[in-house]
Amino acid sequence: MTRQELFKKVRSARYTHLDPETASYYAEREGNTLRLLFEESNGKTDWKNNFRFLAIPTKPYKGMTATWFAHRGFFGVWKIIEPHLVDLVADPTVERIEIAGYSHGGAIALLCFEYCTYHRPDIEVTGIGFGAPRVFWGPVPRAVKERMAGFQVIRNGGDIVTHLPPRLFGFRQIGQLEVVGEPVGPIEDHFPSAYKHALTE
């Protein structure tokens, strides 16, 4: 599936809503591949979570020695979704996991990628965040940083969302950053139509 096709899929998928306006996901199997998608902000509660960017210390798994810090709002949404994906991710017939999200969903996709690479180091895991905001804060442990190296953030032009929360507040981009498209405006560059156009070039 091309990135253009994946972006279209992210925007058109029929999401399972676990909490109105808060947590949603889409999961499908295609052969041995598990595809997990996360949608953009879909209500006032999502927007409130987007601005709950106080960082919290995170040690999400039993026996995990490394502590890292994450955006409080995004991490809270991910923890609602996580229990619904545990069995899907652990399924031994899954040989590849493909993760993607747009905007708010890009941040959740990043946290899902971290979860999947930690729990399924035996398989290929890919992750893309289209117009994804920053999630990690402060120093990131080497083991976590190495796992996250395969996550790709796609930034269209000067998309302002990919610069938030600001570095001034200690947040940092993690993974690989790729810029597509020509800058038009910091807000306009975040529009779905702008990403759709940039990904066709």
Where in the sequence are the language-model features?
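Non-catalytic, mobile gating and regulatory segments of ester bond hydrolases
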Residues: 1-100, 104-201
